[in-house]
Amino acid sequence: MGFFRRKVAPASKKPDKEHEDTRNKEDVKKDDTDDAPLAMFVILLHVLLKVYGRQRHPRVESFETLKDRGDIVEYRYIPGDVTLIYISHEWVGTDHPDPDGTQMYHLTYMLERLKEGKISRTDMDAFHSLLYKHNVTTTADDWKRILNSEKTYIWYDGFCVPSSRREDGFRSIPSYIRRCDFMIILAPGCTHFDRIDPRTKRKMNLCYRTYRLRARCVFEMF
């Protein structure tokens, strides 16, 4: 896992026409305008852990399934201040982000340990430490406070972007990242379901090194 603590920037609450919320418009936060093609949808951390936590191979469901169930909410309608955590990762399948739930298992396991104070501290990943010439440490007490809050949300592309609007979601990533307080780089060792390593002729092994070689992942890191 890699961690990158970001500075919070003013966030937009521009409505998304296709998935527009029907609640009273007076409930919408007033904020700076934003030209992101797709509104930001997020999942409450507690809901994420309830749905996917403590499962060895959780089935990662689609945006449409979670939205219909009420698990996904549009960011601009969340009242008050919140903490946003952006999950950056390399897809494990060509058509599905995590076909057997391996990455989601590692993510929820790590979040639960941080939430319970079982990890003493986290430091900024090596890439960003070198890039920004400093390190940022988040202590166990900090993580317990953040992750036990009812106002901590997760953005994960696998189920926070409508399947019919992947391109709009990709183009909106800079806006999403600006809004987030933390980025977690999810890059556990695992095997890609479809991609073949040209050297070994076998399915490619994924890790932090392959994550950094993917163009979109590098884009997110900056």
Stretches found by the model and what they are:
Residues 2-222:
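The feature represents the membrane-entry module of six-transmembrane cation channels
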